[in-house]
């Protein structure tokens, strides 16, 4: 990374970058291990994907100026908490709190600050779970506690945040009132969607494999033909003797006359 705004502290900035980059690697490794263990033990991985980044010097300088701080490496380390950032995308809101709890329980991680924008969304509708943590980076001659910001959100939250950022960028951060209102309404839809998907997931988990099989066994054969008509295409039992281009289009009247069985979703109808 370049350092145009820190040219007088080039070496110090390189050293700081080493710390932040090392901290990100450690956090990413921990998350990968947790996700793999969760998948092995619970047959489910709560993390969809992870991204990480280090703030650009220009963005860091802008943040310091907004807080009336002098542009020095010392102030960056002391006052800019999100120089190194990790974003974790989960499937459900319950996964967010599960991951946050697992991170907090790591013996070498200190949780410095938490902001729950899911329980209390920002005024513009933004929702996410933020953690500022400190993780030790072991160098040859010392150990340095290095800060990392961790953002945890669902796929739906991430979609809204990404599109909201693009829209505001086009307006240079000054979107018209009706646009802001529409975005806020979209955030409410996203919150409803997350809650609905979470409820569905909890209901699905209540079904055991046995109950699912029992439910499937109760589906009348007549329903299969209805589904077949909706799908429109089917595979003949004797398709091995047909050329690919001769594969017939499903027709219930034809089926009744010929009496041939057809495969539908792995079932013979």
What does each of the following model-derived ranges do?
Residues 23-24, 28, 32-68:
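Surface-exposed, low-hydrophobicity interaction/linker segments
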Residues 47-50, 76, 89:
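Glycine-rich, low-complexity intrinsically disordered segments
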């Amino acid at each position: 990374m370049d350092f145009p705004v820190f040219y007088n502290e080039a070496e110090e900035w390189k050293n700081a970058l080493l710390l932040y980059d090392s901290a990100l690697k450690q956090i990413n490794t921990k998350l990968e291990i947790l996700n793999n263990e969760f998948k092995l033990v619970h047959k489910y991985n709560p993390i969809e994907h992870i991204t990480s980044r280090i703030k650009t010097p220009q963005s860091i300088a802008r943040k310091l100026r907004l807080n009336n701080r002098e542009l020095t490496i010392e102030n960056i380390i002391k006052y800019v908490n999100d120089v190194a950032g990790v974003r974790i995308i989960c499937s459900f809101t319950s996964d967010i709190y599960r991951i946050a709890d697992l991170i907090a329980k790591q013996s070498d991680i200190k949780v410095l600050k938490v902001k729950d924008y899911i329980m209390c969304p920002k005024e513009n509708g933004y929702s996410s779970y933020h953690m500022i943590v400190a993780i030790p980076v072991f160098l040859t001659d010392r150990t340095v506690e290095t800060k990392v910001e961790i953002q945890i959100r669902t796929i739906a939250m991430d979609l809204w945040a990404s599109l909201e950022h693009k829209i505001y960028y086009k307006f240079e951060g000054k979107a018209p009132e009706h646009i802001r209102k529409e975005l806020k309404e979209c955030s409410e839809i996203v919150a409803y969607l997350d809650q609905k998907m979470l409820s569905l997931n909890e209901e699905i988990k209540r079904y055991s494999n046995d109950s699912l099989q029992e439910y499937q066994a109760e589906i009348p054969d007549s329903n299969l033909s209805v589904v077949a008509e909706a799908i429109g295409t089917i595979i003949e039992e004797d398709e091995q003797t047909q050329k690919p281009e001769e594969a017939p289009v499903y027709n219930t009247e034809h089926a009744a006359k010929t009496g041939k069985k057809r495969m539908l979703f792995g079932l013979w109808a």
